[in-house]
Amino acid sequence: MILELADIRIQPGQQAAFEEAIARGLSTVAVRAKGYQGAKVNHGIENPERYVLQIFWDTLEDHTVGFRESPLFTEWRAIVGPFFAAPPVVEHFELSFKSA
């Protein structure tokens, strides 16, 4: 399993609309992507315009090729992209340790 972390900064004052949009994008677009396992959206406390999106994929290629190079990515960005203050910083991780 691969964890995608996207550090997202949105336009000020758009939190409620962004949260609705990202929930809609995940539930209508991301769920149709091959290898998509689920997601979590985390809202910044100290910085209310910051979100950390966690998406779980079967493989790295399911995200970087299967999703990013498909029409689904265009749909996704049309829903969430208008809220971005800057392009998200995206990185991928593999699990090294899990507590009980």
Predicted regions located by residue number:
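Active-site-flanking beta-strand signature of metal-NTP-handling nucleotidyl enzymes
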Residues: 3-8
